[in-house]
C-alpha cells in the first residue's frame, strides 16, 4: 500500500497478525521480502512498550530529541515543560520514569515522539496503556494538532473508534500472514472534535469496519 505526505493511516487486525512487524520493517529492524520506499529525512517511533531512560528525569527524557537536534538544553526543557502542562504531567518533571504510573509513562513517550519532529511518525498502540479519559484527551490533542505537526503518521491500534477518528484511511489486515483485506477511506472533515463521534458517517464507518473484521 501507499501512504501520502501528511496522511494518517491506521492498521487494524487481529493480535499477532503482523501489524507491529510492518512498523519494524519500515524501521529496518526486521528482515522481509519486498520493497519499502520512503521519502522524508527521519522517522519518529513510539513502541508499545516505552523505551524511556530510567537514569534521566521525565523532562530530560521528553526533551532529548530536541537536544539531539542541536537545541540548547534549557530551551529544549522549556519546550517540553509546556507539553507537560498540556498532558497532565505538570509537577512530575523531576521524577524518574520508574516513579511514574504506566499511563504517565505512555504520555511521556508520546510527548517525546511528538517532539522528535520527524517527517514520519510510527505509533504502535500509542494510547493503549492509558485510561479512557486520558485516551480521549490524547486523541483530541493529536487531531487538533495534526496540521501543525505536518507529519505522516502510521498507527497500529485495536481501537476501531480511534482508527476512524484519527485516520484518513484504515487498512484492515487478515490473520497471519497479514494481507490487506480492505482499505477504508475516512471522509470526515478535519479538524475533528468530540462532535465527530456522533456524526452519522462515523457510525456507518464503525459498522463497515466491524463487518469486515468479524465476517
Model region roles, listed by residue range:
Residues 115-119:
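A short, proline-enriched helix->beta-strand linker immediately N-terminal to the Walker B motif
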Residues 96-100, 104:
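Conserved ABC ATPase signature
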Residues 27:
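Helix-to-loop junction immediately C-terminal to a conserved catalytic motif
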Residues 12-14:
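The feature captures the beta-strand-to-loop junction immediately N-terminal to the Walker
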Residues 56-63:
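Short coil-to-helix segment of the ABC ATPase nucleotide-binding domain corresponding to the Q-loop/switch region
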Amino acid at each position: 500500500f501507499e501512504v501520502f505526505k501528511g496522511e494518517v493511516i491506521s492498521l487494524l487486525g487481529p493480535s499477532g497478525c503482523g501489524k507491529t512487524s510492518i512498523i519494524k520493517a519500515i524501521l529496518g529492524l526486521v528482515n522481509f521480502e519486498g520493497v519499502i520506499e520512503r521519502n522524508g529525512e527521519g522517522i519518529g517511533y513510539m513502541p508499545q512498550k516505552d523505551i524511556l531512560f530510567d537514569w534521566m528525569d521525565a523532562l530530560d527524557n521528553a526533551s532529548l530529541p530536541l537536544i539531539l537536534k542541536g537545541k540548547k538544553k534549557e530551551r529544549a526543557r522549556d519546550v517540553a515543560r509546556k507539553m507537560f502542562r498540556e498532558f497532565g504531567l505538570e509537577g512530575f518533571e523531576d521524577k524518574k520514569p520508574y516513579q511514574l504510573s504506566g499511563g504517565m509513562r505512555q504520555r511521556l513517550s508520546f510527548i517525546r515522539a511528538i517532539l522528535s519532529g520527524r517527517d514520519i511518525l510510527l505509533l504502535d498502540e500509542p494510547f493503549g496503556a492509558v485510561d479512557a479519559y486520558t485516551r480521549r484527551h490524547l486523541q483530541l490533542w493529536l487531531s487538533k494538532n495534526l496540521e501543525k505537526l505536518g507529519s505522516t503518521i502510521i498507527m497500529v491500534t485495536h481501537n476501531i473508534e480511534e482508527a476512524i477518528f484519527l485516520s484518513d484511511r484504515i487498512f484492515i489486515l487478515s490473520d497471519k500472514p497479514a494481507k490487506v483485506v480492505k482499505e477504508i477511506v475516512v471522509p470526515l472533515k478535519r479538524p475533528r472534535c468530540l462532535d465527530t463521534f456522533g456524526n452519522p458517517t462515523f457510525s456507518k464507518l464503525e459498522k463497515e469496519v466491524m463487518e469486515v473484521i468479524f465476517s
